[in-house]
Regions:
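N-terminal secretory signal peptides and thylakoid transit peptides that target proteins
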Residues: 1-23
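Short cysteine/histidine-rich metal-coordination sites, predominantly Zn2+-binding motifs
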Residues: 115-123, 133-143
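Solvent-exposed alpha-helix faces
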Residues: 20-21, 106, 124
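Iron-sulfur (Fe-S) cluster-binding segments and ferredoxin-like electron-carrier domains
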Residues: 108-113, 125-132
């Protein structure tokens, strides 16, 4: 068998496709890598400190509707009845989350039986006892949790958000 009989005839389309992939790879390696400390995360900005409720307003497994960091961002304040990571208050059992599903922005509802926030749109579920960790569904990130503080009078303040709220480029909107 002749050596040239083993060669494969690459058509024009295959050649151009291969050249395009090679050019894209060369361009990607020529771009400077983005530094990890290049700028603040969209979720790590200056947040307002807003009073959400008082300890006396909350009952175990009864969601308390709130809005943070502004009126266009619905959330829920929950007293879970047992201490959890990220919980505040005398029993470390109070947490707050955005109620916009990070997948498509559907409004979430609280299910007391398993202490989860569930999405009716595409069935994502988030564990309120595990800092809003996704436990099921289409979402690709955990639920944004509000950073809380309780003062000596029992007032509960939200002072930040740990993830980007659905539909926003920045959690704190320009006034």
């Amino acid at each position: 068998m002749k050596r040239c009989d083993r060669l494969i005839d690459v058509g024009r389309r295959q050649f151009l496709a291969g050249a395009a992939v090679a050019a894209a790879g060369a361009a990607a390696t020529a771009l400077p890598a983005r530094s990890a400390g290049a700028g603040p995360s969209p979720a790590l900005v200056d947040y307002p400190s807003i009073k959400l409720a008082n300890l006396t307003d909350l009952q175990v497994d009864q969601p308390f509707d709130v809005a943070y960091p502004d009126g266009d961002s619905p959330g829920v304040l929950l007293k879970l009845g047992r201490a959890v990571d990220g919980g505040v208050g005398p029993d470390a059992d109070i947490v707050a989350f955005s109620t916009l599903c990070p997948h498509k922005g559907f409004p979430l509802h609280y299910v007391a039986d398993d202490k989860s926030l569930d999405c009716p749109g595409h069935y994502s579920r988030f564990d309120c006892e595990k800092q809003g960790m996704q436990i099921w569904g289409q979402a690709t990130q955990n639920l944004p949790q509000f950073r809380l503080r309780v003062d000596d009078a029992g007032d509960i303040y939200a002072e930040g958000v740990d993830e980007l709220i659905y539909g926003r480029l920045n959690n704190v909107l320009a006034g």
